[in-house]
Amino acid sequence: MISNRRSAFALSAAIATLCFAAPATAAKFDGNWNMVLVTTNGHCGVIKMGMAVNGGHISATSGKFAMHKLALAGLISGSGATKINGVAGPRQAVGTGRFTRVKGSGKWTGTGPSGVCAGVWTALRTSTI
């Protein structure tokens, strides 16, 4: 009886580990990154921010635009492809691009009270988790 309980517990623990572990392919991008957005169309200027990647999920760690805290949400696939959504007060932006283990780059577009902006972004990894 005890042996069956131990086996059931071990099986449950193994299943939970498999179900909740981050995919290894997305985890290779985990860490802290510095990101810079440069405007090529519009009046949004240069935006610098910190971001974190955990299990392929992107979030902002620092940065402001027009006195509003920046918020990011996005995913990096196992191949490095990404789509990122950003918000700063009434302003919203969407970016796409690609990451490697040490850098990333892509394009973005945004809208806000002053109109439409677009540009390019780059990111450099500063540490791993």
Segments (PLM) and residue ranges:
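Sec/Tat signal peptide C-region and signal peptidase I cleavage site
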Residues: 20-26
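Bacterial N-terminal signal peptides that target proteins for export
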Residues: 2-11
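General helical secondary-structure elements
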Residues: 1-2, 24, 121
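Bacterial N-terminal signal peptides
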Residues: 10-19
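Central antiparallel beta-sheet cores of small beta-barrel/beta-sandwich binding domains
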Residues: 27-129
